[in-house]
Every structure is written in structure tokens, then in C-alpha cells.
Amino acid sequence: MPELPEVETVRRGLEPVMEGARIIHVEQRRADLRFPFPAGFSEHVKGCRIEALGRRAKYLLLHLENGRVLVSHLGMSGSFRIEESGSDKLRGDFHYARSKAEKHDHVVFHLARHEGGSARVIYNDPRRFGFMLLLDSADLEAHPLFAGLGVEPTGNALDGALLARLLAGKRAPLKAALMDQRLVAGLGNIYVCEALWRAGLSPRRIAATIATREGKSTGRSERLAGAIRTVIAEAIAAGGSSLKDYVQADGSLGYFQHSFSVYDREGKPCRKEGCSGTIQRFVQGGRSTFYCPICQR
């Protein structure tokens, strides 16, 4: 499933084409994805100017001039691609559209761009676990999808002091706590594994032990907060990780998977200088966890 860096990469890829463009027409080729489309979906967005493209956790947010927000979640295999007018080439690296996947093109946005010309933005989703919703912008933060979301792991908002307060008293394993979207929004399996390795903390450790009993920051919470921010920033800069179904909006692949230190490296030597450990895998919360039992404590 695409995680926060992948969704942010898609947002940045779509932004130059979609922001400021007007939606001339929407081809909705089926009645549902994971959930049914909102009633009158195509008509509600037709003719609207896209004011801004945002992101909250793993959700893409298209802010429309009519006061509504088109919320899109990529699910397991959802992706967007861009086709410029007069060409079937994808913008950017000139990857041609993959004809075998066209049967999974479920939504096509026909756009008039603000600087002139036109484009099509196509949503493709073989497994159909993604979805699209239309919400009034005033109701966005109160909607069940967003009301309980925690702090974003980007920028400086997530520091050691805040992380200590969030995890104080939590008896869950540290990895499970970090993936609780009510605490930190947008973190997923891959990047939690990587951040824990960088911070030298075991995914099995009780979450509360990175803080004092009073919920104050410690060296552990400071290291972990810094590792989370750095891993997310580096993954965004690398265009995310191309595992299975994920591609960027221009059709190209992400490259952060080439920087993995623990994820999907079971049985390989730990990359930390001076560590003699071997990366191990175990199932935690129904997901594969990768870590070094020597340097992660």
C-alpha cells in the first residue's frame, strides 16, 4: 500500500498539471471502487477550478472552487497518470501508457489548464481498494476519516517532546504504537521499520519506555523523532518506494527502496557500521517487521 511519501510524491507530480486547471468533464467508468462514488459525482465537479492540491496522512485532497474537497485514497494499487493534449505520452520521462492496464482506468479527468492547453489525468486501480469522496471543506476536519488523525511526521511538528507525550503510558509494542494513525498520521510499515533501525530501537520495545514516567522526552524519543522525520523526507526526495503496484504520476518509479536498511532484507547483514547482526523478520500485527536484534534494543 502506498505510504505517506508515495502519496506526497503523487501530489507533487499532479500539482503542476491540476492546480489552477478547470475540470471540463469526468469519465466515471464504473459505479464504485472500494466504496460507491458519491451520487452525482461527475456533475458536482464538472466545471470547477482546482484551487489547490493538498494531502493529509495518506489522503490526496483536491480543493475545488465550489467549496468542496475531492478526497482520494490510493488503496493497495491505485495510481494516477497524466497525458498531455495531442499525445499518448506521459509527461515527465515520456513513459507510454501501458495498454494492458487500460481496463483498470476507472476515472478520467479532462482538464483545461490555466496556462492554455489541455490534459487528462487518469486514475487506474486494478484491485479497486482505493476510493473517492466529495466533502464540504468546512466539514473536512470533522469527518470520521480525518477527525482522529494525529500529527504529521513531516517538518518540525513531530519532535522528541511531542513523541514522548504521545507514547507515555502506552503498553503496546513501539512499532504498533507508531502505526496508530491517531498518534502519528501517515506512518506505515516500511518507514516505521526504517526509522526504528536508524534510532536503534527494537520494534518489540514497550512504547512508553522511550519517555519518562512523566511523559518527558528522553534521548530515545529525540533519536526516534529525528529518524522518522529524516526517513520520510529522504523517501519523498527519492520519489517514494516502488514496491509492487506503486508508480509516480509521470509513470516513473520511486527509488527509496534502494536505500532500505532493514525492510525486505531478511537474512542480510546489518548495514550499521560496526554491527555484526543479521536482519530478521517476524510478523507483528499481521505485517512483516524487519529489524536487527543486535543494534536495535
Swiss-Prot record:
MF annotations from Gene Ontology: 8-oxo-7,8-dihydroguanine DNA N-glycosylase activity; class I DNA-(apurinic or apyrimidinic site) endonuclease activity; damaged DNA binding; zinc ion binding
GO biological process, one term: base-excision repair
Record's keyword terms, sorted: DNA damage, DNA repair, DNA-binding, Glycosidase, Hydrolase, Lyase, Metal-binding, Multifunctional enzyme, Zinc, Zinc-finger
Annotated catalytic residues: 2 (schiff-base intermediate with dna), 3 (proton donor), 58 (proton donor), 287 (proton donor)
The enzyme's E.C. designation: 3.2.2.23, 4.2.99.18
Protein residues bound to DNA: 104, 127, 170
Signal peptide stretch: none
Cofactor notes: Binds 1 zinc ion per subunit.
ZnF region ranges: FPG-type: 261-297
Cofactor(s) essential for the protein: Zn(2+)
Superkingdom of origin organism: Bacteria
Catalytic activity reported: Hydrolysis of DNA containing ring-opened 7-methylguanine residues, releasing 2,6-diamino-4-hydroxy-5-(N-methyl)formamidopyrimidine; 2'-deoxyribonucleotide-(2'-deoxyribose 5'-phosphate)-2'-deoxyribonucleotide-DNA = a 3'-end 2'-deoxyribonucleotide-(2,3-dehydro-2,3-deoxyribose 5'-phosphate)-DNA + a 5'-end 5'-phospho-2'-deoxyribonucleoside-DNA + H(+)
Reported function: Involved in base excision repair of DNA damaged by oxidation or by mutagenic agents. Acts as a DNA glycosylase that recognizes and removes damaged bases. Has a preference for oxidized purines, such as 7,8-dihydro-8-oxoguanine (8-oxoG). Has AP (apurinic/apyrimidinic) lyase activity and introduces nicks in the DNA strand. Cleaves the DNA backbone by beta-delta elimination to generate a single-strand break at the site of the removed base with both 3'- and 5'-phosphates.
Assembly with partners or alone: Monomer.
Similarity-based family: Belongs to the FPG family.
Name of the molecule in the record: Formamidopyrimidine-DNA glycosylase
Protein source organism: Chelativorans sp. (strain BNC1)
